Amino acid sequence: MLLNGIVAAVITMIITIIGIPRFIMFFHKKKLGGQPTLEDVKQHASKAGTPTMGGFVFVVVSLVVSLIAALVFGKFSPAFITAWWVFAMYAVIGFLDDFLKVFKQINEGLTAKQKMLAQILIGIVSYFIYSHGEKSHIIHLLSWEFNIGIFFSIFIIIWLVGWSNAVNLTDGIDGLASITVAISLTAYAVIAVAHQQYDVLLIILSVIGGLLGFFVFNHKPAKIFMGDVGSLALGGFLAIVSILLHAEWTLLLIGAVYVIETLSVMLQVAYFKKTGGKRIFRMTPIHHHFELGGFSGKAAGWSEWKIDIVFWLFTAVLSVIALCIYFAF
């Protein structure tokens, strides 16, 4: 069964590698604007005009390949459907947001209220799909289990909304989000194999394959960005996978980078309002803080490659620690 997932991953990666250049050509041919650049970060000046919405390619390819594989290998289960649904619907939200920004020149895209309402609705539907295949509504913490009944629906909504936006914040420099999420998903692939949840493993490996294919064009200097269509989908997918594998708490370690990125923004905003304009960090999310010199006081900060490598290694180490703790209990 693991081999089936690996084959799906390789197919997804190859199709993504073939599809991305054509997507980039489409953007250039239509002379569409790229993802907005940060004026405060001089290193980002060269990114102006770089195509975005690349997540559309790896999301669609991952969805199609995993669906075909699930039907062929008999893994079209409630768990697979739930993961597939969340990944697809969060991609739809991101696609609409990107579409308004890029094609309609509406800088704001979807409003915060529109995004939140859509995410809540997806969370509610996800709860009912998940409940069809689950007899209990249990949250797992190490060796303890907590059956929270109907409140599990609220947990799913909060979990999905929180993690989707956290990954969205992490997608700020070349290659950062794509490989960080790939590492996180690899940890969940290990858990899926250990518990023989090959239905969930199938879509996990398909998404990893898509991310690796996308990274070929997203590493520094990026030829394309994933956009909200990619980052929101990946965050929601990570959240639902942790639930489906009954390993919710592990995401706090496996996804520590996303937590830190989000907390840096929250702390910055709160401190800015409290002090009337003072800042804790040079810029948030925190990866931009390191780009601008961090706490060193120097004008020159870390290169994007250095930030990527540090964040990837941090995620890999914490993922291993999370797995060790998980299997110990």
Swiss-Prot record:
Localisation: Cell membrane
Disulfide bridges in this chain: none
Cellular compartments per GO CC: plasma membrane
EC number: 2.7.8.13
Catalytic activity entry: UDP-N-acetyl-alpha-D-muramoyl-L-alanyl-gamma-D-glutamyl-L-lysyl-D-alanyl-D-alanine + di-trans,octa-cis-undecaprenyl phosphate = Mur2Ac(oyl-L-Ala-gamma-D-Glu-L-Lys-D-Ala-D-Ala)-di-trans,octa-cis-undecaprenyl diphosphate + UMP
Membrane topology term: Multi-pass membrane protein
First-level EC class: transferase
Pathway noted in the entry: Cell wall biogenesis; peptidoglycan biosynthesis
UniProt superkingdom: Bacteria
Cofactor(s) named in the record: Mg(2+)
Family: Belongs to the glycosyltransferase 4 family. MraY subfamily.
UniProt-recorded name of the protein: Phospho-N-acetylmuramoyl-pentapeptide-transferase
Lineage start: Bacteria, Bacillati, Bacillota, Bacilli, Lactobacillales
Annotated gene: mraY
